[in-house]
UniProtKB/Swiss-Prot annotation:
Protein's name according to its UniProt entry: 24-methylenesterol C-methyltransferase 2
Main location: membrane
GO BP field: methylation; sterol biosynthetic process
Reactions accelerated catalytically: 24-methylidenelophenol + S-adenosyl-L-methionine = (Z)-24-ethylidenelophenol + S-adenosyl-L-homocysteine + H(+)
Gene: Smt2-1
């Protein structure tokens, strides 16, 4: 009798712990995703592990993925796979804005994120009635912040259909669906008319392009003459040394875990922009002092990682989450360590800002 009572008690405690970790502790900072809602985008549950293995195999040597035209052409499809694998985990553990921002004294991560996004609208001099393009919009966190801050209309493009559906749902919930539109497409060949946008921006998105010239060229094409473009670029800084094994390991880890066909150098960005016809108005690494470290949130999230790892393992064991989710979650944790090292050593920045303008008269 006592044994039975103890067994029932243990079972009750176990279920209570599952409830606590999954439903109470398992929500994202920005509500909308719970651990039990985790999906792998449009990938069916039985294909998750295979898709993860294919992704990891393709990006095992990042800079080799774009060395030939044939391999470069495969990059968009694997970026799509990457976002199928990680979108729900990002929303659950990070929020609706898939980017970093400098920490602000006495302000929450959410507030720091909003300020970082609103800076884009201010740089673009965005106004009510303007039509802006969000190049690589994800699930639309920046889009909604910029539309609300500026009064502009925003059209976002993402290669991932699952993100399109998530962004549209968030737009409706925020009451911004009349001013925020989302299109599924490749930003290397955008389905928009020439000179159809007043301004454009990309927040930590063009790093997925094998050649930056291609995406910058498309942005140049769809901007109206005189239109402004702001981009936050992931780059290696002048402190990076290719003969330093620790530097190489950190950068390769960032590239492998974030679907990047090779990070570009900081000093390349402006020249590439000029090559496609842009005027460079401003260039600044927003991570430099007096800005506070952008990687603080990653370091503070280590406890959350162990909690979330336990949640993911429990859900996989209960067959609520598909096989392969644990591997994806582990990959993202390891990538976070590489990102932190890149930030602490100063060899990497995710927010090298360039402000560009399409000339009023084409040369």
């Amino acid at each position: 009798m006592e044994a039975a009572t103890m067994a029932w008690t243990a079972a009750g405690v176990g279920m209570a712990l599952v409830y606590w970790f999954v439903w109470v502790m398992g929500a994202a900072e920005v509500k909308g995703k719970r651990a039990v809602d985790l999906k792998m985008g449009s990938i069916t549950n039985d294909k998750v592990k295979d898709k993860y293995t294919q992704y990891w195999s393709f990006f095992r040597r990042p800079k080799e993925t774009a060395t030939t035209e044939a391999s470069a052409e495969k990059v968009p499809a694997f970026v799509d796979t990457f976002y199928n694998l990680v979108t729900d985990i990002y929303e659950w553990g990070w929020g609706q804005s898939f980017h970093f921002s400098p920490s602000l004294p006495g302000r929450s991560h959410r507030e720091a994120t909003r300020v970082h996004e609103e800076r884009v609208a201010d740089l673009l001099q965005a106004k009510p009635g303007h039509r802006l393009l969000d190049v690589g919009c994800g699930v639309g966190g920046p889009m909604r912040a910029i539309a609300a801050h500026s009064g502009s209309n925003v059209v976002g493009i993402t290669i991932n259909e699952y993100q399109v559906n998530r962004a549209r749902a968030h737009n409706r919930k925020a009451g911004l669906d009349s001013r925020c539109e989302v299109v599924c497409g490749n930003f290397l060949s955008m389905p928009f008319s020439d000179a159809s946008f007043d301004g454009a921006y990309s927040i930590e998105a063009t790093c997925h392009a094998p050649r930056l010239q291609d995406v910058y060229g498309e942005v140049f094409r769809v901007l109206k003459p005189g239109g402004l473009y702001v981009s936050y670029e992931w780059v290696t800084t002048s402190l990076y040394r290719a003969d330093n094994p620790e530097h190489v390991e950190a950068i390769h880890g960032i590239e492998r875990g974030d679907a990047l066909p090779g990070l570009r150098r900081q000093d390349e960005i402006a020249s590439i922009a000029k090559e496609v016809g842009f005027e460079v108005l401003k260039e600044l690494d927003l991570a430099l002092p007096p800005a506070l470290p952008w990687w603080t949130r990653l370091k503070m999230g280590r406890i959350a990682y162990w909690r979330n790892s336990l949640v993911v393992r429990v859900l996989t064991m209960l067959r609520i989450a598909p096989k392969g989710v644990c591997e994806v979650h582990e990959m993202l944790y390891e990538t976070a360590q590489h990102l932190t090292r890149g930030g602490e050593t100063g060899i990497f920045t995710p927010m090298h800002m360039v402000l560009l303008r399409k000339p009023v008269e084409s040369k």
